[in-house]
Structures are given as C-alpha cells and as structure tokens.
C-alpha cells in the first residue's frame, strides 16, 4: 500500500473531523442563541430601531391673591438634526442659517456631525418653529418645549425668582416651591429603519407628561405695584442706594407685598440692571461684556439679592417697640412713669446722646415713646437688666429666623449674653450695636400688636394640580404667645399716639387710626455719616389688619425717618386701606389701658 496515500487519507480524516467539530460547535452556538438568547437579541435589535424623545411637562404657574397669573409658560421650540436622516445637507444648512440667523460655519459643523441627535438652537419662538417645520426637511426635528414667562417683567422679581435653562427654579419662590411647581416629563418611543429614519405610521409607545402644580400665593399684584411705585419715587427723589417695603397681614403673617428697588427683569435676569444707583455698579453694568465671568456673577448675585430677608441692619428706633413691650410686660415700667432727658445719658464711661441735643426734659414713658427719646429707653433697658432683656429678646423670637418661605434668610446678629455689658444693653435698647433683617423686625412688631401671638411670614397659600384634582394647603400655625393681650393692647395705644401726636405724624391719615414708629439709624462705620431711614406702621391701630415697613438706604439730603419714610407709608395706606375694604372712621381708638 502506498504510504503517501495512507498519509493523505489520514490528513483528510483529521480535517473532516475538525470541520465536523467546528460545525457542531457553530450549530450548538446558533441553537443557544436562537433558543436561549433570542429575547435578548430581539430587544437589542428593537432598541436599534427605537428612538426615545422627551415630551416636556409644563411648569406650574404662580398665581396672586386675586387669581392673577404672575409666572406662566410660553411654548418654545428646540431645533435639532439627526445625521442619518438628513438627505440634503446643503439645503438644510441654508434654511437653518437663514431662518435662525446663525453663522453658517456653526450650523454646518452641527449638521455634518455624525451623532444620533445634534441640537441647533433652543428657545426658538413657536411661530418660527412652525415655519421651519413647514419646510419638511428630512432629518430636522422641531420639538416643543416650555420657557418661563413673567407677564409683569420686574414686578416682585426678588420674591418670585426665575428659572434656568432646564426650567428649574434658581432663586425666590421658584426654587423654594420647586417640588410643587416642577412637572414630570413624558416620553415617546418611535420606530426607525436601518438608516435611522423614522417610520411613519409605525406603532409607538407614549407616556404623557404631568404638568406641575399651580402655586397660589398671598402677594397682591395691585398692592405690590403701588408699593413699588412709591419705592421708586423715593429712590429717585432721595437718590438712595435702595429702598425696600414689606406689607403684611399682622394677624396671620401673610405677605401682601415685598419690594426691593431697584428690581430686575425676570425675563432677562442675566443682564445687569442699568438702574443701579451705585456709580460703580452703573459703570460695571455698562461694561458687562468686559467683565470677567466671576465678577459678573458677583454683580448678578448682588442684583438678585432680596434685602428684606438676605441683609441685616441696625433697626434704630423702630426697635424701641420691642424694648417698650418687654418693659411693659415685665412690669418694670408703666405709661405714667416719669423720666428726665437732659439730652444724654451716661452709662459707665460712655455718654450716649439723645437725638434732641437740648433734651426733652421731664416726660412720662408714654411721652418718651412719642418723642422717641433715647435716654428713656436706655433707662427701661437698665431696669430690665441683661438677663431680663435677653429673656424677652428670646421670648419674642428675635434670636432665631422667622421661617419665611424664601431661601437665604439671614439670622440675627446679637451680642452673646456673657459679652453684653451695661453699655451694650443701653445701645441695644434703642436699636443699635446689633443687626436684624427687615422681615424679622416686621414679624416681631406684628406679633406684639396682634394680641401677642408669634406669626410666621409667608407667601405660599396652596398648591393646586393642573386638573384641580389635588389641593395641598400650606399650614403656618402660631408659634405661641409672646406677651399678654393686655400688653399688646397697651402697645397699640402707645404706637397710635406716636403717629397722632408724636414723631410719626407724617404718617397720619384722616379718618383712620394709624399706629407706628420712626427710625433713623446710622450705618457702620459711623464716620461715613450714612443712614437708613425707616418707618413701620399698622392700621387700624385698635385692630391691626395691615402692617408695612419701609427702609430707605443712604438717602441724600434730609434723612430723618419721620420726615421721609413715614409719609410713604401714609400714602401707601391711603390707597390700600380702602382697596382692602378697611373703611375710614372718625371714631376714637377704644383701648383700655390698665394703670394709665
């Protein structure tokens, strides 16, 4: 037998065996994939031919106390291209450049980019989006989205806040109530062929979006408008740095208005305000393009800042409301108690002056309050002592925050009890050497005159689903009694006398009983001679339904609170009291004060 033939047959046999083994292995693998992994690969194949697109949910609206929409949504479009679906790139580039006003190089780069989806432009007006859709360009998608829109532009800008590019809240109520306002996006799954082109009339899975809840708030657009108008008048007349006004219902803490002028345009929040009073900021606003990014962001943060809650200041004589209430509640002073004011008071080694250089002479405590006499309130503070004063400072809720439903509330800056000597006690008694926020002052004053119940300042009333099927009411229970009804009634009487016969006369309003207190506080450092003029008022004095606080930062010329701040609140009340249904009356205040 031929040995070569035998060897050749063996080689053929080995090769046949190897082929058989490979075939069996491939058959086994194929059987495994077809039987056991078919579901997996079917899903992969389906995924390759499915395209998921988001259906944006509408953000909930913000609605004022009268049902007026003050934060809404506008339909806008996002223009994008899908590379595999574009059939005429030059035509697509030409149309998009022309209609969107974009640079050709930019559009070409995006149209020719090999990606599943490339965004050309966002926030395109719906009218223009519809026009582009009408071209029926292969591979060009026009998807509808929502953009936040504020019908009143700058009204209550630092209260409402605004949203970012992702339609999420950034500042103000927009961020505080984000979980209620934001909706839940839906999605749509469409089928496409091997080239990625959508198959028309193919079955699709669709999950509908759920719109966010509407937020109903206590802010009243009409009161806010008028308060802003008055604030801007003062800002311009006194060339002030800024002006703030807070309007509150002292019975429950509902905020009807909160003004911080200059405000900014909510529909264009990243452009520096050209109305900034500070010369340095004006120059920066005019040179926005030249500002480093970090510097511009710093200026934007300053522009967005809500003075009423984010900033602290020395309240000055408006804080005498707290000292008087503590003194009366503790019993260390009564209205007819006699005091003497020679124009100063010496405490330890310090000579602390009254605003009236020649002094007020002999006066009762009531007269001292009407005259806003520093020595009288220094004496009341000394009678209380450090322990007593600290007790009421804490009891009245001044050491903590108010709990207002806005982000970034600043805390009170106060001496530590162990570091508070008689001099510090003296200056605190008439509103100096410590700092609080305007919202803390008005909240505490409201709690003193409303019968003695500590309230929580707030805007949020309820969140209502788009289909009205769900209503979530926000609760703000009283934080407890801080002083007796008797002391509260006495304080209402005292503060009415301040307006009717004392330093707050310019807030007097014919036919109405108004209570209030003036203040002129000197800013730090004292050497600069810069002032904050303020006035806090409420009406009717015997049954407070509305309270307002104005602060005027660095007014030029005459700067006394009783002269420039009190008249503003008088004008405000003249317009909003009838609007709120509070009728004028010539009756005298019916207040019973024990041991007058």
Question: Where are the regions that the model predicts?
Answer:
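Beta-lactam-recognizing serine transpeptidase/beta-lactamase-like catalytic domain environment
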Residues: 71, 193-204, 219, 250-318, ...
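Periplasmic/cell-envelope proteins involved in peptidoglycan metabolism and beta-lactam response
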Residues: 1-286, 303, 312, 334, ...
């Amino acid at each position: 037998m031929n040995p070569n033939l035998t060897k050749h047959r063996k080689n053929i046999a080995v090769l046949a065996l190897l082929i058989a083994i490979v075939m069996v292995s491939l058959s086994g693998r194929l059987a495994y994939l077809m039987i056991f992994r078919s579901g997996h690969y079917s899903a992969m194949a389906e995924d390759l031919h499915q395209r998921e697109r988001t259906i944006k949910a509408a953000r909930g609206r913000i609605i004022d106390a009268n049902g007026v929409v003050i934060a809404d949504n506008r339909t806008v479009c996002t223009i994008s291209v899908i590379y595999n679906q574009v059939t005429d790139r030059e035509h697509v580039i030409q149309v998009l450049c022309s209609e969107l006003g974009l640079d050709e190089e930019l559009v070409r780069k995006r149209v020719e980019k090999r990606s599943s989806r490339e965004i050309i432009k966002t926030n395109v007006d719906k009218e223009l989006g519809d026009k582009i859709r009408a071209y029926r360009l292969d591979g060009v998608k026009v998807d509808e989205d929502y953009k936040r829109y504020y019908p009143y532009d700058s009204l209550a800008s630092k209260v409402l806040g605004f949203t970012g590019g992702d339609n999420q809240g950034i500042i103000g109520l927009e961020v505080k109530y984000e979980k209620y306002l934001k909706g839940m996006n839906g999605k749509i799954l469409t089928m496409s062929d091997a080239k990625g082109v959508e198959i028309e009339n193919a079955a699709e899975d669709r999950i509908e979006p759920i719109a966010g809840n509407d937020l109903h708030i206590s802010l009243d657009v009409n009161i806010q408008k008028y308060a802003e108008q008055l604030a801007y008048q003062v800002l311009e007349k006194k060339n002030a740095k800024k002006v703030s006004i807070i309007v509150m219902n002292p019975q429950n803490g509902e905020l009807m208005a909160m003004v911080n002028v200059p405000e900014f345009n909510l529909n264009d929040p990243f452009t520096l305000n050209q109305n900034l009073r500070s010369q340095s900021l004006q120059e920066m606003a005019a040179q926005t393009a030249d500002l480093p990014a970090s510097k511009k962001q710093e200026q934007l943060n300053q522009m967005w800042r809500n003075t009423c809650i984010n900033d602290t200041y020395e309240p000055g004589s408006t804080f005498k409301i707290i000292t008087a209430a503590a003194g009366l509640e503790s019993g260390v002073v009564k209205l007819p108690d006699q005091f003497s004011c020679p124009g100063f008071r010496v405490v330890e080694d310090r000579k602390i002056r009254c605003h009236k250089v020649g002094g007020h002479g002999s006066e009762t405590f009531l007269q001292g309050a009407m005259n806003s006499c520093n020595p009288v309130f220094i004496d009341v503070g000394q009678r209380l002592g450090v322990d007593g004063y600290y007790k009421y400072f804490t009891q009245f809720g001044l050491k903590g925050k108010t709990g207002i439903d806005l982000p970034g509330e600043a805390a009170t800056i106060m001496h530590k009890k162990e570091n508070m000597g008689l001099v510090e006690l003296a200056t605190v008694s008439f509103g100096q050497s410590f700092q609080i926020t305007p919202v803390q002052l008005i909240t505490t004053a409201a709690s003193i005159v409303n019968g003695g119940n500590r309230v929580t300042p707030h805007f949020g009333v309820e969140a209502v689903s788009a289909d009205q099927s769900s209503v979530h009411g926000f609760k703000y229970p009283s934080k407890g009694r801080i002083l007796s009804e008797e002391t509260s009634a006495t304080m209402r009487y005292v503060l009415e006398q301040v307006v009717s016969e004392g330093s707050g006369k310019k807030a007097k309003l014919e036919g109405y009983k108004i209570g209030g207190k003036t203040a002129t506080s000197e800013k730090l450092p004292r050497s600069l001679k810069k002032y904050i003029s303020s006035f806090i008022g409420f009406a009717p004095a015997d049954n407070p339904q509305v309270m307002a606080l104005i602060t005027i930062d660095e007014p030029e010329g005459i700067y006394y609170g009783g002269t420039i701040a009190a008249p503003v609140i008088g004008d405000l009340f003249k317009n909003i009291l009838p609007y709120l249904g509070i009728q004028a009356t010539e009756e005298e205040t019916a207040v019973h004060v024990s041991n007058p």
